[in-house]
């Protein structure tokens, strides 16, 4: 409850301070006595007397003093006679009286034209802020010394007197922090009791954002950088692709078909097993592991449209096909081939091993070129240049998937749902007897 700067309080606030002081003492003592009931009821009677005896009390519709008397008698009721059969009956009677009194006082918070009590006081008062049907009084507990020092919490005593007597309310408050300005009444940086209702100061820790540069400062060597200062993935792929093209790598010798052209994740198990067998035969696990890691980390997608050889000459067809291949794979990094694989293709590895193992060939045995001469719009798959090994199990897998996809659209049929619970298929419905 705040006190007006000029010291003038609303008469209702005077009554509420007595109620809070009595409730606080009951909570501290852990019990209720008849004297608390008597003090609160006496304070309410004094409030009614003050309101009726004000120099100027104005009402728009009726006599304000007569209206106050009638409504206050309804609040008091028959509780003036303190004859209770038990302590529980006394507590229930006190709570009922307190609820009626608070409802009666809450109407003074409303403006007269909104229906309050229709009464205006012709002197400046501070408005009352209370709840309508209940009263909640919360005391902030003292913070243990293990969490914060006792010097961080100070207590301020608010004293005032009324017709009932002297009222003192102890309000916990916070000490002034170092470097915080404010009036001091008792020295030692303690807060003035009149300003004890001031809330704690919010402490905000600045969040420092550090920019990290993996490849150097932004703009170095003409590379574009993202927000974090690192190089963009697209720039790294383009740089790797340009470096591979400069090295003169043969496309047909190191690009194999993947199921990624069908919109699916490629299966790396066959390549991992082939890399492990090659590392065991070569006796060098480090080179095989390095090649396998570089191959697994790269996602190669090929989408090349071939044309008919009948419409063009052989030279023009080869040049345009190579140009399309380079353009389609310009932004995809390619794995580097080890020297051991090149020796195996030429047969030098088998000669050096003394005939212990046959020569290993990683280049495709055949090149399958799909010639798109059809103008049908029902074609569901674009023409793709297939570069595969005959012993590669992915060859059979990809061809099977393509054949199944083509036959699925014949006759406008849709694939049958695998789940028997969709659209009521496969359900055993009870027979009607």
Swiss-Prot record:
Transmembrane region(s): 36-58
Subcellular location: Host membrane
Cellular component, GO, one term: membrane
The keyword Membrane is assigned to this record: yes
Keyword terms of this UniProt record: Host membrane, Membrane, Transmembrane, Transmembrane helix
Organism (species): Psittacid herpesvirus 1 (isolate Amazon parrot/-/97-0001/1997)
Composition-biased stretches (Basic and acidic residues): 265-280, 354-364, 422-433
Start and end residues of each stretch annotated as Disordered: 169-433
Broad class of the protein's primary localization: host cell
Name of the protein this chain belongs to: Uncharacterized protein UL-1
Compositionally skewed regions (Acidic residues) per UniProt: 216-227, 234-254
Topology term for the membrane: Single-pass membrane protein
Coiled coil: none
């Amino acid at each position: 409850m705040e006190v007006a700067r000029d010291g003038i309080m609303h008469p209702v606030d005077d009554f509420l301070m007595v109620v809070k002081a009595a409730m606080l003492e009951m909570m501290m003592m852990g019990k209720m006595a008849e004297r608390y009931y008597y003090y609160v009821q006496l304070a309410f009677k004094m409030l009614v007397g003050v309101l009726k005896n004000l120099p100027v009390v104005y009402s728009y519709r009726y006599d304000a003093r007569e209206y106050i008397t009638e409504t206050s008698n309804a609040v008091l009721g028959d509780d003036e006679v303190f004859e209770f059969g038990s302590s529980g009956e006394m507590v229930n009677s006190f709570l009922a009286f307190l609820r009626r009194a608070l409802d009666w006082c809450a109407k003074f918070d409303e403006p007269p034209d909104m229906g309050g009590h229709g009464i205006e006081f012709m002197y400046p008062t501070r408005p009352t802020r209370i709840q309508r049907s209940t009263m909640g009084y919360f005391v902030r507990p003292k913070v243990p010394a293990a969490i914060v020092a006792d010097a961080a919490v100070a207590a301020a005593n608010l004293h005032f007197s009324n017709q009932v007597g002297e009222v003192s309310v102890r309000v916990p408050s916070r000490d002034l922090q170092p470097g915080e300005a404010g009036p001091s009444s008792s020295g030692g940086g303690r807060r003035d009791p009149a300003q004890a209702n001031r809330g704690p100061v919010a402490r905000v820790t600045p969040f420092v954002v550090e920019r990290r540069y993996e490849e150097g400062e932004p703009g170095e060597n003409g590379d574009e950088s993202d927000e974090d200062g690192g190089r963009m993935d697209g720039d790294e792929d383009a740089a790797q692709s340009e470096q591979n093209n400069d090295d003169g790598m043969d496309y047909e010798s190191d690009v194999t078909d993947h199921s990624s052209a069908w919109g699916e994740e490629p299966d790396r198990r066959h390549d991992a097993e082939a890399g492990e067998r090659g590392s065991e035969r070569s006796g060098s696990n480090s080179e095989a592991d390095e090649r396998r890691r570089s191959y697994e980390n790269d996602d190669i997608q090929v989408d090349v449209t071939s044309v008919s050889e009948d419409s063009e000459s052989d030279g023009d067809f080869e040049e345009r096909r190579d140009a399309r291949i380079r353009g389609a794979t310009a932004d995809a990094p390619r794995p580097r081939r080890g020297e051991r694989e090149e020796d195996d293709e030429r047969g030098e590895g088998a000669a050096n091993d003394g005939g212990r193992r046959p020569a290993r060939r990683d280049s495709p045995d055949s090149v399958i070129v799909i010639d798109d001469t059809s103008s049908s719009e029902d074609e569901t798959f674009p023409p793709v240049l297939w570069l595969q090994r005959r012993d590669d199990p992915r060859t059979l897998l990809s061809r099977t998937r393509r054949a199944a996809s083509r036959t699925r659209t014949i006759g406008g049929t849709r694939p049958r749902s695998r789940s028997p619970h969709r659209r009521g298929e496969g359900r055993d419905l009870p027979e009607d007897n």
